[in-house]
Regions:
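Alpha-helical transmembrane segments and their immediate juxtamembrane cytosolic regions
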Residues: 1-246
Length: 246
């Protein structure tokens, strides 16, 4: 289990596999792609777990978030080039792991502000409270903005080409919930990993509960296979390393 003790290597491997998982449907047949998706299902919770621990110890969270935003734009550019020159994807099907981590980071920063507010002694600084709530609500506000822009350009007065490129560009540039990898629930899972960072048993329980519900609701989606990520997470030593790992 030596690989699981090297958090930096595991972090890079998880990111690479998640990017691979994003392009997987374009590279393989439907049957092969379905079975390969198991890798992404298992790696995703591991990445969220490592991100929660690393982000907590990071000294410059703002720099991390800017880096994630730039990486998300770079990945979106890759999607756009493939969509235009190789295989039509459609921006509706884009899944951006870096944008997902950015939104998780926004929730985490909001949580930090609220924790600082709660720990204050004497007169409370309500600015921290508003900053915390604002950071948590910001992804939802931006998602609503993206939705409204999309509805505006869907009017018959605009051509389909304008709608496709403008709405697609806005959706891919702004941190919205429309392009998160595997859905909003995984963002919430990553946020809960951060909240319960020191309670590994609760983290295991979160993965287990999510896997059970996924199996009961959609057994053929293979999302439930993420339960096996608990094995890898169990052998991850809690080393205090910042994000990105060095």
């Amino acid at each position: 289990m030596k690989i699981f003790t090297h958090r930096s290597k595991l972090m890079y491997l998880a990111i690479f596999l998640m990017i691979f998982d994003s392009f997987r449907p374009l590279l393989f047949s439907l049957d092969t792609s379905l079975y390969l998706s198991i890798v992404g299902r298992i790696v995703y919770p591991i990445l969220l777990f490592l991100f929660a621990d690393s982000f907590y110890h990071a000294t410059n969270k703002k720099k991390i978030m800017i880096g994630l935003l730039l990486l998300s734009w770079l990945l979106s550019l890759g999607y756009g080039l493939i969509d235009h020159f190789i295989v039509p994807i459609g921006w509706q099907n884009y899944e951006n792991i870096f944008m997902t981590l950015l939104i998780v980071a926004m929730f985490n920063v909001g949580t930090d502000y609220l924790r600082k507010y709660r720990k204050q002694l004497g007169r409370k600084n309500y600015i921290l409270r508003f900053q915390g709530i604002g950071m948590i609500l910001l992804p939802f506000i931006l998602s609503f903005l993206v939705f409204e822009i999309g509805m505006f350009f869907l009017k018959p007065t605009f051509s389909k080409a304008i709608v496709y490129y403008i709405v697609g560009a806005v959706m891919l540039m702004l941190p919205s919930l429309f392009v998160v990898h595997t859905g909003v629930m995984m963002v919430i899972l990553g946020w809960l990993f951060y909240i319960f960072r020191k309670r590994r048993g609760i983290q295991y329980l979160l993965i287990l509960v999510y896997s059970i519900f996924s199996f009961l609701l959609h057994p053929y989606s293979l999302q439930w296979t993420m339960v096996f990520s608990i094995i890898a997470i169990h052998f991850c030593h809690r080393e205090k390393k910042t994000w990105p790992p060095v």
